[in-house]
């Protein structure tokens, strides 16, 4: 028996896919029985480094508006479909999972032609275009929010997170996290994360705050993204705070363990915030699937787990941080609210469903 997981593009698709693959292995499936499919972006590095077989196809995203590229898109999708279908038949693949992004559509077409079950996992409160298209071929759909829009009835299981976050224990990790970032346990910590690609607008707002801060002392652990680290490396922080800048972090459990409050985008990665019980200030991005980051942020805000700051108001970040980071009562309520809506075992649930489909 073999399994196929199609997830490509940004970390919001890639890492949930990896979490499901690792959950399959934990359940007794061999790594060589789990085939990952994607393109040439983040997935082309992450999956092979994790020890999984990887099929790379030539792909590009689905355009939402007419263009010259739109005219050639059917041929690109059809070629990817043929490549994936050939591999499904060669390996004897029995079930597939698509996690959105451009690879999901040709995967769905391949599953339909091969006659094997397709499952979908949607990371956002508003389904992306690829998952909406692929839903016509899906037997089961798993969603990360209770009222996900665009996919009809889905099973609310949460968004898969990797084992270190699914079994997260802040108190156990706290001392190690402080040591990793050379932090002083006497002062609160603001952790900043712009996603797998970083976030330029958030980085600029944090840099402005760090250089001009004149309030109570605190510390910043700033995950800038590799493409932005050089832009910020030489800037000096105010005397009232410590500012640690990091391009990439492979121990996100320690990143969240260090944090008293997190500033982040509100893509599918909000599942990590809820799994770790991290109070947050969310700044929805105006890219990707239409309005999905706003919808994700609104759910956490309504649940009491986060505050939401619009992109247009990002200049007021310092004021919001000052009002929140030193309010231990509010932080505790936000932490409890985040944990209340978390579904940290999503990867295990989806892996179990995939195994059941071929039993």
Question: Locations of the language-model features?
Answer:
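Conserved nucleotide-sugar phosphate-binding/catalytic loop shared by glycosyltransferases and other
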Residues: 3-8, 30-76, 157, 228, ...
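Active-site-proximal region of nucleotide-activated glycan assembly enzymes
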Residues: 35, 112-175
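Donor-nucleotide binding loops and adjacent catalytic segments primarily
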Residues: 41-46, 173-179, 183-261, 294-297, ...
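An amphipathic, basic-hydrophobic alpha-helix
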Residues: 66-95
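Acidic donor-binding loop of glycosyltransferase active sites
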Residues: 93-95, 249, 257-270, 278-279
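C-terminal "capping" alpha-helix adjacent to the active site of nucleotide-linked donor transferases
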Residues: 303, 308-309, 313-329
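A short, well-ordered alpha-helix in the C-terminal region of glycosyltransferases
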Residues: 330-344
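C-terminal alpha-helical cap of glycosyltransferases
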Residues: 343-359
């Amino acid at each position: 028996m073999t399994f196929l997981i199609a997830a490509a593009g940004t970390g919001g698709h890639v890492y949930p896919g990896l979490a499901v693959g690792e959950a399959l292995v934990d359940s007794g499936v061999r790594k060589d029985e789990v085939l990952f499919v994607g393109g040439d972006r983040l997935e082309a590095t992450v999956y092979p480094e994790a020890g999984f077989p990887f099929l790379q196809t030539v792909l590009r995203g689905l355009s939402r508006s007419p263009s010259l590229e739109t005219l050639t898109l059917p041929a690109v999708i059809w070629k990817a479909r043929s490549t994936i279908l050939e591999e499904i038949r060669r390996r004897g693949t029995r079930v597939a999972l698509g996690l959105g992004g451009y690879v999901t559509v040709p995967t769905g077409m391949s599953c339909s032609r091969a006659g094997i079950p397709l499952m979908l996992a949607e990371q956002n409160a508003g389904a992306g275009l690829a998952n909406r298209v692929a839903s016509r071929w899906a037997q089961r759909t798993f969603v990360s929010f209770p009222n996900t829009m665009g996919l009809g009835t889905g099973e609310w299981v949460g968004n898969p997170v990797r084992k270190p976050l699914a079994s997260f224990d802040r108190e156990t990790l706290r001392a190690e996290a402080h040591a990793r970032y050379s932090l002083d346990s006497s002062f609160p910590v603001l952790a900043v994360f712009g996603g797998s690609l970083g976030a330029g607008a958030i980085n600029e707002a944090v840099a402005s705050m760090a250089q001009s801060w004149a309030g109570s002392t605190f510390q910043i652990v700033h995950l800038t993204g590799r493409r932005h680290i050089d832009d910020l490396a030489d800037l000096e922080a105010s005397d009232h705070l410590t500012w640690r800048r990091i391009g990439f972090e492979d121990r996100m459990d320690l990143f969240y363990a260090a944090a008293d409050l997190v500033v982040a985008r509100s893509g599918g990665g909000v599942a990590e915030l809820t799994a770790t019980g991290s109070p947050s200030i969310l700044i929805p991005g105006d890219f990707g699937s239409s309005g999905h980051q706003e919808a994700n942020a609104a759910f956490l805000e309504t649940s009491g787990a986060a505050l939401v700051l619009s992109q247009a108001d990002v200049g007021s970040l310092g004021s919001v941080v000052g009002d929140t980071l030193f309010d231990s009562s509010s932080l505790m309520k936000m932490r409890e609210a985040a944990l209340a809506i978390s579904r940290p075992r999503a990867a295990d649930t989806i892996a179990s469903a995939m195994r059941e489909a071929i039993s």
